[in-house]
A protein has these predicted regions:
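A SIS-like phosphosugar-recognition module
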Residues: 1-179
Length: 179
């Protein structure tokens, strides 16, 4: 599985997902140290439930080349409730009335996890954080920095250099001198 999707079930983790894509891409997309093979794992950062409709179909029924990591938040520190409103012809949705919005988000996440587990051959894991705090996000960042280093060792790349990025910088410097 050469594609890893992080499916974070909170818009507050949007920038974490962007950081993960940058970290994973620049650290793992390289030549192997002891061979001429190009290797790397393609990172994709998704926000649930927004990206369920655009990307879940690809994960469920597309090429089996993706693993998925879900990130859930137990306490959103937000008491927003779904209003107690009955809409004509949509009475079946009344079960959502007075439900905390955060509970709906986590139930959606749980349902997607269950659907993927039913597929039986899509690797997935789940990270649950208590709440979005500096300490918890710092721990998540530290975990991914360590994980990236370990994966680099497994696929035999130096996670701490950027030869592909450097090549573009060298060409840019040369072009700027020509101005």
């Amino acid at each position: 599985y050469n594609i890893n999707c992080i499916f974070a079930y909170s818009e507050t983790l949007k920038y974490f997902c962007q950081w993960y894509v940058q970290l994973w891409g620049e650290s793992l997309g390289k030549h192997q140290r002891n061979s001429a093979f190009h290797v790397g794992l393609t990172p994709i950062g998704l926000i649930g439930p927004k990206d369920q409709h655009s990307f879940l179909q690809l994960i469920m029924d597309g090429t089996r080349d993706k693993s998925v990591t879900f990130i859930k938040i137990e306490d959103f520190h937000d008491n927003t409730m779904i209003p107690d409103i009955t809409l004509p012809h949509l009475e079946m949705l009344d079960s959502l009335n007075n439900l905390p919005f955060s509970k709906l988000i986590n139930k959606q996440c749980d349902s997607v996890i269950e659907a993927l587990l039913d597929q039986n051959n899509i690797p997935l894991d789940t990270i649950t954080i208590q709440s979005v705090t500096e300490s918890n996000i710092g721990s998540l960042i530290f975990y991914y920095e360590l994980l990236t280093s370990l994966v680099g060792e497994l696929i035999d790349v130096n996670t701490y250099d950027q030869p592909g990025v450097e090549a573009g910088k060298i060409i840019l410097k040369r072009k700027l001198k020509e101005l």
